[in-house]
């Protein structure tokens, strides 16, 4: 397989490049009969799209989605759903100086050695532009999961560069370009980003994502454990270099008396497991975090080599996000939704008739 398809029963195959005519995806396995329109998909695409603030790339893309197939008279038919998003604001001349060189931290070097050819315009297939159709596909998954189980998704940025962002309220997240759950820290974040751009540099970020009202039983041990699939999905997002589930690396310093989530008739007393035990969802919130590296495309000159192996200095021009993490929250939600959608269908197919006693306890005792 060439690595362009995600999922087992609910599959998403993406296509296109950053500076091609269009990008898109084909979704297979969506159950029939669900009411669906472009408006159901556009909301999340608008949350992810570029050009929405001075702190992200100024490439102006409307990211307007077109449904080409799989929907008839406003309902899904159970056949493949094709989504198309046309590229409208390519500026390929910005990449003329890197066609024969390799940008440090980018996929240029590895794509060249793997395929023997590469598209240097905006990173081609390796561009984060290709997360747009993924977000579109996940909007369909989110809608189905909400209607079937009441499952909802939310995320926020919890760190920008060196600045930790204390959590205040989810209510703040939709009201700022950073997806920050803290309103008072916004001036500091804006000043930090302005300094980065002025100095021709970039930074990383940490994104937290949560799924609520997740049914118990999702996950396929041993090799398709739910937390393993979530980690796999989040690591597949551009620039992600680390993933935590639940307490994550904090688990190292915890004692067993602290880490193990106690069960009571009223619910779980804590959620260090992040909603997954033995690779199977517990019915608690699924919680995960991901670390995003600094953007590799910066205006500061860096050492590299050209295709002939000669030493050179590389400066990257063009319109780039000084922190790709600023627009990553909807993408993290999307990948989590695709995992849960796929596993919901897999669980329903094999274990949909299973009933045990006692019934599941509440997600939380608090």
From Swiss-Prot:
Query: What detail does the entry give on cofactor binding?
Result: Reduced FMN (FMNH(2)).
Give the cofactors, semicolon-separated. Answer: FMNH2
What are the record keywords, sorted?
A: Amino-acid biosynthesis, Aromatic amino acid biosynthesis, FAD, Flavoprotein, FMN, Lyase, NADP
Q: What is its EC number?
A: 4.2.3.5
Q: Which Gene3D superfamilies match?
A: Chorismate synthase AroC
Q: In which pathway does it act?
A: Metabolic intermediate biosynthesis; chorismate biosynthesis; chorismate from D-erythrose 4-phosphate and phosphoenolpyruvate: step 7/7
Q: Disulfide connectivity?
A: none
Domain of life of the organism in this record? Bacteria
- UniProt-annotated binding residues for NADP(+): 48, 54
- What the protein does? This reaction introduces a second double bond into the aromatic ring system.
Q: Which PANTHER family match?
A: CHORISMATE SYNTHASE
How it assembles, according to the record, is: Homotetramer.
Q: Name it.
A: Chorismate synthase
């Amino acid at each position: 397989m060439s690595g362009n398809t995600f999922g087992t029963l609910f599959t998403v195959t993406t296509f296109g490049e950053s500076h091609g005519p269009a990008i898109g995806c084909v979704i297979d396995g969506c159950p029939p009969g669900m009411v669906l329109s472009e408006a159901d998909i556009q909301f999340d695409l608008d949350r992810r799209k570029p050009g929405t603030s001075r702190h992200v790339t100024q490439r102006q893309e409307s990211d307007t989605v077109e449904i080409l197939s799989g929907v008839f008279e406003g309902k899904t038919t159970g056949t493949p759903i094709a989504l198309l998003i046309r590229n409208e604001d390519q500026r390929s001349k910005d990449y003329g100086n890197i066609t024969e060189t390799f940008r440090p931290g980018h996929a240029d070097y590895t794509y060249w050695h793997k395929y023997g050819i590469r598209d240097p315009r905006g990173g081609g297939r390796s561009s984060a532009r290709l997360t747009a159709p993924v977000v579109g596909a996940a909007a369909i998954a989110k809608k189905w999961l909400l209607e079937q189980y009441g499952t909802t998704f939310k995320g926020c940025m919890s760190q920008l560069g060196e600045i930790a962002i204390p959590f205040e309220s989810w209510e703040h997240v939709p009201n700022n370009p950073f997806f920050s759950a803290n309103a008072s820290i916004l001036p500091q974040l804006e000043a930090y980003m302005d300094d980065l751009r002025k100095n021709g540099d970039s930074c990383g970020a940490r994104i937290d994502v949560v799924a609520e009202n997740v049914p118990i039983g999702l996950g396929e041990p041993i090799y398709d454990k739910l937390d393993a699939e979530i980690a796999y999905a989040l690591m597949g997002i551009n620039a992600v270099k680390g993933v935590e589930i639940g307490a994550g690396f904090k688990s190292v310093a915890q004692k067993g008396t602290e880490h193990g989530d106690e069960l009571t008739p009223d619910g779980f007393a804590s959620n260090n497991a992040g909603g997954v035990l033995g690779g199977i969802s517990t019915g608690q919130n699924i919680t995960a975090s991901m670390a995003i590296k600094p953007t590799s495309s910066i205006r500061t000159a860096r050492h590299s080599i050209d295709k002939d192996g000669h030493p050179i200095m590389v400066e990257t021009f063009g319109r780039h996000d000084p922190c790709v993490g600023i627009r990553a929250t909807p993408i993290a939600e999307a990948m989590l939704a695709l995992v849960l959608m796929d596993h919901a269908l897999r669980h329903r197919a094999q274990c949909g008739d299973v009933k045990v006693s006692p019934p599941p306890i509440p997600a939380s005792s608090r």
